[in-house]
Curated annotation (Swiss-Prot):
Entry's transmembrane regions: none
Native organism: Shewanella oneidensis (strain ATCC 700550 / JCM 31522 / CIP 106686 / LMG 19005 / NCIMB 14063 / MR-1)
Pfam families per record: DUF480
Biased composition (Polar residues): 169-193
Protein name: UPF0502 protein SO_1867
Lineage, top ranks: Bacteria, Pseudomonadati, Pseudomonadota, Gammaproteobacteria, Alteromonadales
Region: Disordered, residue numbers: 169-195
């Protein structure tokens, strides 16, 4: 399963609203667009048009990750996810796991502490240890759905990211690149040192030349 940024946002919103506002679920295109563009609890904040959300829905429908629903007497089409915990889904998750995956889809990589703080409307974790236990289970599945990122400089906790979206792959690649300097960067550093040494030698020569001229000037005046 590989989701684009827009698809991941749509799935995350459907997962979230199913739990937090069940009376409004499934969601219409308009309601889903508003959910995708929320200014809070979203990272990054997006400004998707209804057309962009519809494109994401069409793509997810082809992947059989969402379904459409029309009520009697209503022409408004509403959408619900088939991402997990349905008879059509291979992915079966606990409510705790759904909360963690949902938050990672909506807000990107996070620490266990951040996940516990932000999950209160989705699941009531007793403490960070419970979050960490759930994360461990998700990482030890036959098909892991989470991965741990290298610890950031100056931070005590590692962050975790989901493995469903393209964004998570980019984050992982960036983290690994930052954690392990490449041969190209080492080569560039060596080149910079050579240029710096050449510049220093040039400046030393200019200083010596100016010193000689100054001494000659002083000698001519005395």
């Amino acid at each position: 399963m590989e989701l684009t940024l827009h698809e991941a946002r749509v799935i995350g919103c459907l997962l979230e609203k199913e739990v937090t506002t069940p009376e409004q679920y499934p969601l219409s295109l308009n309601a889903l667009t508003l959910a995708c563009n929320q200014k809070t609890s979203r990272e990054p904040v997006l400004e998707l048009t209804e057309a962009q959300v519809q494109d994401a829905l069409d793509s997810l429908n082809k992947k059989r990750l969402i379904s459409e629903q029309s009520g009697f007497g209503s022409r408004v089409v509403k959408y619900k996810h088939r991402f997990c915990n349905t008879e059509f889904s291979e992915l079966q998750l606990s409510t705790a796991a759904v909360a963690i995956v949902c938050l990672l889809l909506l807000r990107g990589p996070q620490t266990p502490g951040e996940l516990r703080t932000r999950s209160n409307r989705l699941h009531d974790f007793k403490d960070v240890l419970e979050v960490e236990a759930c994360i461990k289970q998700l990482m030890e599945r036959d098909k892991p759905v989470l991965t741990q990122l290298p610890r950031e400089p100056g931070k005590r906790e590692c962050r975790y990211t989901e493995l469903f979206s393209q964004g998570s792959e980019q984050v992982s690649a960036t983290s690994l690149s930052a954690d392990s300097p490449s041969a190209d960067s080492n080569s560039l550093n060596a080149q910079d040192r050579q240029q710096l040494e050449a510049r220093v030698t040039q400046l030393e020569g200019q200083v010596a030349e100016l010193k000689d001229k100054l001494e000659s000037l002083i000698a001519s005046l005395s």
